[in-house]
From Swiss-Prot:
Catalytic activity: 3-phosphoshikimate + phosphoenolpyruvate = 5-O-(1-carboxyvinyl)-3-phosphoshikimate + phosphate
Location in or out of the cell: Cytoplasm
Designated name of the protein: 3-phosphoshikimate 1-carboxyvinyltransferase
Subunit details: Monomer.
GO biological process: amino acid biosynthetic process; aromatic amino acid family biosynthetic process; chorismate biosynthetic process
Protein's organism: Desulfitobacterium hafniense (strain Y51)
Amino acid sequence: MQINNESKGIRINPMGRIQGEIEVPGDKSISHRAALFGGMAQGETHITNFLLGQDCLSTLACLKTLGVEWERRDAEVWIRGRGFENWHEPQDILDVGNSGTTMRLMLGVLAGCPFSATLTGDSSIRSRPMARVTLPLQEMGARILGRQEGKYAPLTIQGGLLQGIQFRSPVASAQVKSAILLAGLRAKGETMVTEPCLSRDHTERMLRGFGVDLKSEGRTAKVRGGAALSGQEVAVPGDISSAAFFLVLGTLIPQGELLIKNVGMNPTRTGILDALWQMGADIQVEEEREECGEPRANLRVRPAQLHGIEIQGEMIPKLIDEVPVLAVAASLAQGETVIRDAAELRVKETDRIQTVVQGLQALGANAQELPDGLRIQGAKSLRGGAAHSHGDHRLAMAWVVAGLLAEEGISLQGIEAAEVSFPNFLELIHEIAES
């Protein structure tokens, strides 16, 4: 057994070999959107491989509070949509939990609804910047009240008649882009969003699949008001952000081979593969296909020696969520790895630049903060020690990977944070472990 429960936290012991075939849970971004768009659509939407993490369950809970009927059996969800013009004013506060996606996308939809709603979340959500969404929504005509002039949750939004805008986003953020486009569906005229570089495009792909005439070219996407959505069948691919932990583990483990099946291969999300390939990873893409507008494939990973690289610019939005585990890989690569243009990491569930660097240092790695990223000097081994997730699901799982690779293993506090996006993470680790 490689992972032992302790009275406080868990003990992760080093592992020398892995073997097997696994499927990671459904993609978090796509699960959120499938549920939300299903609730906005006319007719039934049937979702398979829905992610059962806490974040996506928060989206379903908010939809129910708004009057949307749905049924779930394990990872299969049926949503009986009646169009979001039939949503009603919630009798209670909408609690998004830890989900920034739920908060920001829901604000976009509610901006065009003729009633008032209040949204809040946990302490992490209440400290994350919302002005990047609330300001353009206010420009479109929504009334939003919140802490520090609507910059932080709790937020109360009074929706109504909206006017389309041409919005140039200061950040490459799929959540910002999606919120404005969703508001644009209920706005007069055309709404256009241009990003500094392209963020993940699940919203654009799925809105088209639900029947919306959405046009996109380069870094710009636009919709016209009045578009109606129709219920669809949505087969959610495995989440490449969840697969990333196993890609790094399979690359750096001394022996073994791992096949990860049905992984989403959206080109706006495959930065982790590009980075690992540049570092020298042995990862093969098999059985490439497309289903429900999203490419997917199987990934076969074998051990390899990695070397340091520089990661910056347009590559960053494609791997922003994978930086914690990529930093673990960099700590065991030959030479130096530098990650820049990633200041967005400072306003995630934690300040991920700070927490990743401090965590790596505590495990014996040579890492330092940059204003917009990290600098990591790789070594032949990682000592191990004590680590804490700080309530951040990506950190929790990155430190498990580090513990499995470290000489002394690690003691980890806060593994329960992984429930947000990967409820069966430790089960899959046990499944592929070979003593």
